[in-house]
């Protein structure tokens, strides 16, 4: 009988869970797992930093709903995962992280790379354990995988001592059991909501990240086709409302901004139906400051209650099944005429929006709306657009339209710099037949820019736009609004065209809207990664900043 080691059990468990990709960087405490992956799969994607490998795993989780997998070695290899895992947990993305550890005999010693891995990750994951017996590896992986994707998804972490990885094992890898299937909410609760909608003057759907799965999106769209209720999306709920439904149901996104049509609608509504809503995206104190909103929740688990979020009823169960049963109970409902008139006024406000004088844009630089418009005109609904954090994120969240769920990706819980390129790599792997667009500032790009080598190595069809202004502008304009000056936000220039070329990617620079259009269309015909450096004029950031909620400055 062939000897089997802990590493075999780990890899067999990943195979049984139908994991396609593993992201990571090897090291002595975990290298037997990497050696085993070479023979058995899943496909190993070697990253250039563990944090970015965790972002890539998060991207898989965000897009597919199944945990992305990341593996790192002990010590700093493990600790470098922290930012990626806290981002995944905060933003509801399933991730399974494995990290090497010193041998069990050294766990309590001041030994090389020894630290309490499981304790480090416990506050920022849903499940954090350390394996002490190689024969339990598969059952622990099975439980970690299940924790990562159940309820509100997030990260699971497993610390594996080197001698556990190298130990002989005598059990087979567990094959995953059928996922528990939630039923709908109770019939009584569904009928309660149906009657509440019929009695309401202006019921509104608030759609969050938890409503963005393909199954739930399909149920929401089916409901909206029959009962045209007004809808507001959070940033991570972008794309739930289809292009066909936009004109009659969609009233914008909420997050960061005050006094936008979506905010006005939520305050005016006498019934807010929060579906898959997570307050980390847009805290209820921002849209329910008066503590007067009547709220009913549809979700997979009970809501977190606070002063500003006190739902009178919670419909807990499978969201799609609940919506499918709600539809026949409210079919035929129409908003009162007065509400329809109000919504038309609100739509006119959306069309008017904040006005900017683009004629004063600095020569050789583009106004943010020029960039957004060129992107909008040259992307299709099936393209994935990943967005980093920075001033560009504010403009993209407000003005860029998306019509498919989980195709416009934001970090809206942690607002983590550096996610765009790693997420683009994930998207390119799981959506191989489309171009991927990623967007960052010149500050955020260099948090993960080394992964351009990963994209080139894999020849992924990624077009990355860098909004280049030479500052951490999202901080800069907020400081200027607070203190009348800025500090700690300036840095030196980088030639991003040469930077791209040094990695083997194509590099371009666009200094006008026409040139950006030409270069973007050229980039769309390339096979591998392309960087487009776009000098941007952020003179209107302060104008846009005046519409940001004061307590949302970060």
Q: Where are these predicted regions, by residue range?
A:
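N-terminal alpha/beta PP-like core and its mobile active-site loop of ThDP/TPP-dependent enzymes
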Residues: 1-336, 356, 374, 378-381, ...
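Conserved short loop/turn motifs at secondary-structure junctions
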Residues: 208-212, 360, 441-443
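Short, solvent-exposed loop/helix junctions and linker helices
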Residues: 4, 134, 187, 362-369, ...
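Alpha-helix N-cap/helix-start motif at coil-to-helix transitions, marked by capping-box chemistry
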Residues: 24-27, 115, 390, 490, ...
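Hydrophobic, well-ordered secondary-structure segments
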Residues: 281-284, 292, 326-332, 339-354, ...
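Active-site diphosphate/adenylate-binding microenvironment
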Residues: 10-11, 28, 33-38, 347-422, ...
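Phosphate/pyrophosphate-binding active-site segments
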Residues: 135, 291-393, 513-522, 526-554
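Thiamine diphosphate
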Residues: 107-113, 243-244, 306-308, 314-316, ...
